[in-house]
């Protein structure tokens, strides 16, 4: 018996909009970007339909989650070794690189695909020049985003296991956490900490307790922010956050966001199909934000479908439970994961890397839905 759900239907409509946006592409070089991104969404859609109809037992879900954690543990070990020892900072030509036209391979995005490495040298305040790890992923931000959405699953598996298995997942969490720090992915790291705090808050059942916590928190924050502003430390903290990777990082992002939105207004319905290179910007329009990027590339129609899918997945996880078992614990950690994903998407584009998209939709969307089938 073939089964389908409302999220799969909305995903199908999103793919239709994605197809329509193809006709808005102006740069021929961007066709490869478009089809690469489209392939990640097609893969995600097929996985959604297949897993919804095939996987219907808890052990199958757990096996899938374990496989993802093991893969990310291996990627994290590679990242930690690459950060620590120069001998592991290998570089090689990818299989795609042998078939890619030289004109495309010489571009910024094409060169990353054609020649693979486990990281690159960068600058960060307090560290100076350092090796920023990306492991098997295209960019360090993709690696940090995938680590951020996988860590809640590793914590969940640690929670439901005992003995040697529990120690293994403890080790996995530590190594993945170290690797996340070595990516210096500021937003991904912040998303983990803030997401955990919000996760613990939404887990509280007492409305009075929640209201009291919010009231005390707002009061303390008001006094603390006032003190920071009066002492001048507040502006120093802002400068530290914004310019920790240099002034160019913050200034470039600001220009990208403004010009991306202005360009979106020219084709608001179905968008531009893909990112676009413009003179004067180091990075293309539609980059550095999953939300703004989706709005730019697929317009209001695609963005509305995308946000609706995220909201539906979140609502599926907000279920009242009266027993403590693997399913109910998974719902809770699923909320943690979604909070991390929602916050991380503000400044990172997650559909550039096929591996990131695969893990994102499997553990962020499919597994909670599969668990709810039973």
Language model region names:
Residues 1, 35-47, 143-151, 189-197, ...:
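Membrane-embedded alpha-helical segments of multi-pass membrane proteins
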Residues 1-20, 26, 32, 59-62, ...:
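Transmembrane signal-anchor hairpin modules in multi-pass inner-membrane enzymes, especially those
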Residues 131, 228-298, 317-322:
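Long extracytoplasmic/lumenal interhelical loops at the membrane interface
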Residues 77-89, 124, 183, 203-244, ...:
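A membrane-periplasm/extracellular boundary helix in multi-pass inner-membrane enzymes
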Residues 9, 13, 30-53, 67-72:
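Aromatic-anchored transmembrane helix interface
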Residues 197, 333-344, 349-374:
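Transmembrane alpha-helices of multi-pass inner-membrane enzymes
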Residues 15, 19, 46-47, 62-94, ...:
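Alpha-helical transmembrane segments of multi-pass inner-membrane proteins
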Residues 1, 16-27, 341-343, 355-362:
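N-terminal signal-anchor transmembrane segment
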């Amino acid at each position: 018996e073939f089964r389908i759900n409302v999220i799969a239907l909305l995903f199908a409509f999103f793919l239709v909009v994605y197809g329509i946006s193809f006709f808005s592409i102006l740069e021929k070089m961007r066709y490869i970007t478009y089809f690469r991104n489209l392939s990640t969404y097609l893969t995600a859609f097929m996985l959604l339909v297949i897993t919804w109809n095939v996987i219907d037992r808890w052990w199958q879900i757990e096996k899938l989650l374990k496989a993802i954690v093991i893969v990310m543990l291996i990627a994290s070990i590679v990242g930690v070794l690459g950060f620590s020892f120069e001998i592991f900072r290998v570089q090689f030509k990818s299989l795609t690189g042998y078939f890619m036209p030289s004109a495309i391979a010489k571009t910024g995005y094409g060169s990353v695909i054609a020649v693979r490495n486990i990281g690159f040298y960068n600058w960060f305040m307090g560290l100076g020049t350092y090796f920023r790890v990306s492991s098997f992923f295209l960019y360090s931000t993709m690696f940090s985003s995938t680590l951020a959405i996988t860590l809640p699953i590793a914590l969940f598996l640690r929670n439901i296991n005992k003995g040697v298995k529990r120690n293994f997942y403890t080790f996995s969490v530590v190594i993945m956490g170290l690797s996340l720090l070595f990516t210096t992915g500021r937003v991904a790291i912040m998303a983990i900490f803030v997401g955990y705090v919000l996760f613990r808050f939404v887990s509280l059942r007492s409305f009075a307790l929640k209201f009291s916590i919010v009231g005390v928190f707002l009061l303390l924050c008001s006094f603390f922010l006032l003190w920071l502003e009066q002492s001048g430390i507040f502006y120093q903290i802002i400068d530290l956050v914004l310019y920790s990777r240099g002034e160019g990082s913050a200034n470039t992002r600001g220009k990208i966001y403004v010009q991306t939105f202005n360009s979106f207004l020219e084709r608001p319905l179905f968008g531009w199909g893909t990112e676009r290179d413009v003179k004067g910007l180091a990075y293309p329009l539609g980059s550095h934000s999953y939300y703004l990027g989706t709005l730019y590339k697929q317009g209001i129609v695609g963005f509305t479908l995308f946000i609706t899918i995220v909201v539906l997945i979140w609502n599926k996880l907000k279920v009242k439970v009266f027993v403590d078992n693997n399913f109910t614990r998974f719902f809770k950690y699923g909320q943690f994961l979604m909070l991390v994903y929602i916050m991380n998407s503000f400044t990172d584009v997650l559909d550039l890397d096929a591996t990131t998209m695969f893990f994102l939709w499997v553990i962020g969307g499919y597994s909670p839905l599969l668990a709810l089938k039973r």
